Amino acid sequence: MTRFLRLGFSLTFLALPISAFPESLPAPQPIAFRVGSLRFDRPDSWRWVPPSDSLRAAQLEKKTPNGTLLITFSRFPNASSGSVQANLDRWTAQFSKLSLPAKTQATTGSVCPVTTLRLQGTLKGGLPGGPAKEIVDATLLGAIFQTEGELVVVKCTGPSTSIGPIEKEFYSLIAIAGGISP
């Protein structure tokens, strides 16, 4: 009798689909991650995804009705990335026309100095790392952290209708990493 029970359990185990095993479960999502010396806390509504190119140290994505939004994180040694202003100018040059004045804010948090930029207007298409086609009403949210020996750059770009609802999350992510009081 015991043999038949063991045989029955063994056959049942063999009949389990492969999806019943842990290897098929999605990878756990990190709650926090590091880019250089900075710690970022992933917002609950965003997913961690592998960086899509070698310049990115980390990448988060969120599905929206207008497509997928990405928050990208990059690290650049101070000598190779230019000044904070050069990076802000580079982002501004990605727009052929601004519908609102650029909004820049420099703050020194308890962790490091942080400069944020918000741009809204027509985002050029066909640029490396940018959209394939021009986006007429686009918004760029950016932050540059000045850490010891490097800049950590965080950026989210997309249609303004998609960026508007996540703007608070983005700035909260930046404030926490930079040690900036709300």
Label every model-predicted segment:
Residues 20-22, 26:
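Boundary at the C-terminal end of the N-terminal hydrophobic targeting segment
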Residues 49, 63, 90-98, 120, ...:
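Structured segments of extracytoplasmic/periplasmic soluble domains
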Residues 88-145:
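Signature of long, low-cysteine stretches enriched in small and polar/charged residues
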Residues 8-19:
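Bacterial N-terminal signal peptides
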Residues 44-46, 148-182:
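Surface-exposed amphipathic alpha-helical segments
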Residues 66, 80-84, 134-137, 156-159, ...:
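Solvent-exposed, acidic/flexible segments
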Residues 1-6:
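Positively charged n-region of N-terminal signal peptides that target proteins for export
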